[in-house]
């Protein structure tokens, strides 16, 4: 089992690390990298069990974070999308000396709904887990459709996500299961108040996985953080409203 993850670095400038979400790989960032590399040294990793890191495996969030930190820049702005946002947040909480600023995209400190907290219904996550054990390619396809649902460019977004996934080795089913367990079980809400670095939270108004109510709930809990909502986006604002997304990142990370 390999402990080395697949990294790619582009451009020159301050270090910026991009972390992808569940079922995906670093290829989802291709367009983002092209737009940001004139301003940053952009580092893209395939998380353990995904893409070119499919031979690696980590059994929980802490182990994923440890493997990612092994070859990451000494200090960087960290940006995590969806599940990647949990990984980036975990790193910011447990290795704050490595994180100058934190950006989360369509992410939540707790993905599973638990009244009054909004999120993914636990039975949806359970259904994904059951489906995963039967046919993981169908599961990923359903998840992609769910991510784009509501976005005016849903069909285009799904196509882009699909192309990214298919351009690299398929994810390791064990790692997919670990990821679903993290989405179902992890709760970083209380820990967030101890974050020491500047934080920007980016959301899609039409997101069906991270309801927009999460943004306002966290505004109350984290008044010193910044947030921005993309009005036309669902779960992948970096695709749906690409230019506006890159502008938010540039202004905050500079």
Curated annotation (Swiss-Prot):
Compartments it resides in: Cytoplasm
The EC number(s) this enzyme carries: 3.1.1.85
GO molecular function terms listed in the Swiss-Prot or TrEMBL record: pimelyl-[acyl-carrier protein] methyl ester esterase activity
Keywords associated with the record: Biotin biosynthesis, Cytoplasm, Hydrolase, Serine esterase
Matching PANTHER family: AB HYDROLASE SUPERFAMILY PROTEIN YCLE, MONOACYLGLYCEROL LIPASE
Function: The physiological role of BioH is to remove the methyl group introduced by BioC when the pimeloyl moiety is complete. It allows to synthesize pimeloyl-ACP via the fatty acid synthetic pathway through the hydrolysis of the ester bonds of pimeloyl-ACP esters.
Protein name in UniProt: Pimeloyl-[acyl-carrier protein] methyl ester esterase
Naturally occurring in which organism (per UniProt): Vibrio campbellii (strain ATCC BAA-1116)
Gene symbol of the encoding locus: bioH
């Amino acid at each position: 089992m390999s402990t080395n993850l697949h990294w790619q670095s582009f451009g020159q400038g301050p270090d910026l690390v991009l972390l992808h979400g569940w079922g995906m790989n670093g290829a989802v960032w291709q367009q983002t990298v092209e737009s940001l590399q004139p301003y940053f040294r952009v580092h893209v990793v395939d998380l353990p069990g995904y893409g070119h890191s499919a031979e690696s495996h980590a059994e929980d969030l802490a182990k994923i974070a440890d493997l990612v930190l092994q070859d990451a820049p000494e200090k960087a702005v960290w940006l995590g999308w969806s599940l990647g946002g949990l990984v980036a947040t975990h790193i910011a909480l447990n290795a704050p000396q490595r994180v100058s600023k934190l950006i989360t995209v369509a992410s939540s400190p707790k993905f599973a709904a638990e009244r009054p907290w909004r999120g993914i219904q636990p039975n949806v996550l359970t259904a994904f887990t059951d489906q995963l054990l039967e046919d993981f390619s169908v599961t990923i396809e359903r998840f992609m459709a769910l991510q784009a649902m509501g976005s005016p460019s849903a069909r285009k977004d799904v196509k882009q996500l699909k192309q990214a996934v298919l351009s690299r080795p398929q994810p390791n089913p064990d790692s997919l299961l670990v990821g679903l367990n993290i989405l179902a079980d992890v709760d970083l809400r209380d820990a967030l108040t101890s974050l020491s670095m500047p934080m920007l939270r980016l959301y899609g108004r039409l997101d069906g996985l991270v309801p927009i109510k999460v943004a306002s709930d966290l505004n109350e809990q984290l008044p010193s953080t910044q947030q921005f909502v993309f009005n036309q986006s669902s779960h992948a604002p970096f695709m749906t409203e690409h230019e506006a997304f890159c502008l938010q990142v540039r202004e905050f990370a500079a």
